[in-house]
């Protein structure tokens, strides 16, 4: 039986922009812009995973409480639709939080991160 994968991701908003990160060409989903996200490990909650993954990928520490805003249960990988569950959390920051990929534990997963507005 195929494993049902569970992930968590965070939409970080500052003013009218959200933070996205461009996946490394060597990682899954190469060169795609996405939310900082990753697998839920062991017995951690989806929110704990979202906060941990965000820190590991961006070196930004988020508060311990985020708003759950939705779920994604299908995704594309290598041109194939796969099933899984991604919990999507939201955090709005009053100040711009700047990722530091060089200091991030898993910063190698991305080539850069930047804020995008609806216009982009």
Each language-model region and where it sits:
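Conserved catalytic motifs of the protein kinase core domain
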Residues: 7, 16, 32, 84-86, ...
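Conserved acetyl-CoA binding element of GNAT-fold acetyltransferases
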Residues: 32-38
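A conserved beta-turn-beta hairpin within the catalytic core of GNAT-like acetyltransferases
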Residues: 27-31
